[in-house]
Each structure stands twice: as C-alpha cells, then as structure tokens.
C-alpha cells in the first residue's frame, strides 16, 4: 500500500468504461447478499487506516465490516444482478491485490487509486471532525453512472451480436420444417433448435448465439434453473425481447416479419433495463438492417418495453454510432 501523493492522470473514454466494470463493485457488489444493518458508519483516524480497513475487508470478504465502512447509503448502491456482482467482486479483489494508493485532492478529501492502472475509486475519503470516512453519499451518483454506462454498453453489444446470430440462423433449416427462417426465440425449447441458443454435444453444431451464451456461462449464468427458467433473468442489468413486426417509421413500411407462422420478413430486438435509473436508462432497438437506436422511455420503461411488438424508431429515437 502506497502513501498519499499528488498525481494527475489522463484517461480515455474506454478506460473510464473499464473502470465502471470493476470499481463500482466494492460498493454495489459487496452488499448484494447481505441485509443492511442499522449500525452507524465507521470512522478512521487517517486515510491510511481507512484504506487498510477496506483492503482487509475486501480480501476477507467480510460483508459485516464493509457494511460499517460504507454505512446506510450503501443500500442504494446494491446491484440487482447477483451473478454480475459476484464476478465483478472477484475482479475487484484481484486489482486491490495488485496495488492501492491514496491521492490527495485537498486537506479534507482523498481518492483511493486501485490496481496497476491506478483506477480512481468512486467513493472519496472525507475528513470530518478530525476523522476520516468513506463518503458514500457523495460518490453515489458516480457509482450509478459507471454501472449504467457499463450495462448500456453491454446491451448495445448484445443487440449487434443478436443481428449476427439471426443472419447465421437463417442459413440453415435448424428446426427441420423445410423452411429457412429467422428464430422467434432467444433460447430453444429443450431438445429443439427453434431458438438462437441450444445445448449441443461435442461434435455437434454450436448454436448461433453460442459466443454470447458462453460468455454468460463464464460469468455464472450457467445453472439450468437460470438459463431455462420461465422467469427472465437480467443479463448485465438488461432484459431482451424479440420483436416480430416493424412500424411505419422503418424503411419498407409497416408489416409483420412472420408469414404463415415463419419469421422470414425480418427480425427485431428490444433491450431494456431491468431497473430503470439504476441498471440502465436507455432502451435499445435493432432490426435486420443492423442499426441500433436508443431512447429513454422513463420510469414506465418496463411496461412500455414489455408491450412493444414492433421495431419502429420514429424521430424520438436516436441512432447509436458504431
């Protein structure tokens, strides 16, 4: 652990999104599996002692100690995606083990930097009445912004991956009905290949959505009860739903993608946050043309997206740049 020093760092946008994937964890992740106690927040005699307390609690996975370190405000920063949270915590622990340092902003505010890349921790250390504490309330907006940014980037990536998967799926009659068509489901029914993902034995053809699902399995979304359960499980804070129509604001006009039971006219997808304002803000849509559009649907995002059937980006939707 290094002592306090003054340092200025320049970071690219890519760096900042990488930070989001890792450093939000010690706040949002460490609380995901524990009830928040009513105990008052812990204060430390120095920034060095505060950093030492955080590092020891993280390494020991001591959630009770972390509860005291971050105080009651930590409850608002819990991640709704337990699998994502657990994996991010492991990643965070690894970077804490690499290196930690303290960067002095002024006599009463210090920022912790973590890992070999010196990523700034979003919760500042603040001095009050001669004691130091983690000002969770002050860092709350930054924590949520980082989480939302990372989740939204993942949702956009899934939209583009979905387009590639559908383009691959239609090249072969996977369901054996004699018709080349797009998949109407994200996951196949057990024992079938009527969706973009299916389980396959060694030597058999992998599903078009294999890479995405493989990544999900690596991150913990691998138990049968979560992969195949009827109740949807958010992936990095987002739900995904196939759209089977397009509206009047789309090239080609309004029509159904499904003809005589087969989706041959095109395909669409909507990606929307599972917890608007916390896991994401923007809703994303894409169709066979591969252009992703975004829009903030507001607090009623869940209801609006669940009722959405058509890909129809009017002037209120914004094109997402590649």
Tell me the role of every PLM-derived stretch.
Residues 1-16:
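N-terminal secretory signal peptides that target proteins for export/translocation
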Residues 36-60, 103, 139-164, 168:
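Short, low-complexity N-terminal intrinsically disordered segments enriched in polar/charged residues
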Residues 62-74, 181:
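Short, well-ordered alpha-helical segments enriched in acidic and aromatic residues
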Residues 71-121, 229, 233-234, 246-248, ...:
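Surface-exposed, charged secondary-structure patches
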Residues 110-153, 157-160, 291-296:
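Short beta-strand edge/turn micro-motifs at domain boundaries
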Residues 169-278:
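Flexible, glycine-rich surface segments
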Residues 265-322:
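C-terminal soluble interaction/assembly domains
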């Amino acid at each position: 652990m290094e002592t306090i020093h003054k340092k200025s760092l320049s970071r690219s946008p890519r760096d900042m999104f990488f930070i989001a994937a890792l450093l939000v964890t010690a706040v949002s992740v460490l609380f995901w599996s524990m009830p928040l106690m009513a105990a008052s927040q812990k204060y430390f005699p120095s920034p060095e002692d505060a950093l030492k307390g955080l590092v020891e609690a993280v390494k020991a996975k001591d959630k009770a100690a972390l509860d005291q370190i971050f105080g009651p405000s930590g409850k608002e920063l819990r991640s709704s995606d337990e699998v994502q949270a657990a994996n991010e915590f492991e990643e965070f622990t690894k970077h804490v083990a690499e290196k930690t340092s303290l960067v002095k902003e002024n006599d009463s505010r210090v920022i912790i930097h973590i890992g070999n890349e010196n990523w700034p921790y979003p919760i500042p250390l603040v001095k009050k009445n001669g004691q130091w504490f983690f000002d969770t309330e002050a860092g709350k907006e930054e924590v949520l912004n980082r989480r939302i940014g990372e989740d939204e980037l993942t949702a956009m990536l899934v939209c583009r991956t979905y387009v590639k998967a559908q383009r691959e799926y239609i090249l072969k009659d996977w369901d054996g009905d004699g018709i080349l068509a797009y998949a109407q489901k994200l996951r196949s029914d057990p024992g079938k290949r009527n969706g973009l993902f299916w389980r396959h034995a060694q030597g058999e053809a992998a599903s078009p959505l294999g890479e995405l699902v493989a990544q999900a399995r690596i991150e913990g979304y691998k138990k049968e009860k979560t992969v195949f359960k009827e109740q949807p499980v958010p992936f990095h804070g987002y739900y995904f739903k196939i759209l089977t129509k397009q509206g009047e604001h789309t090239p080609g006009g309004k029509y159904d993608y499904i003809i005589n039971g087969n989706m041959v006219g095109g395909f669409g997808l909507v990606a929307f946050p599972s917890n608007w304002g916390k896991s994401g803000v923007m809703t994303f849509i894409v169709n066979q043309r591969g252009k992703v559009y975004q829009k903030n649907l507001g607090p009623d995002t869940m209801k609006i997206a669940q009722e959405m059937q058509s890909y129809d980006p009017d002037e209120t939707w914004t094109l997402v740049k590649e």
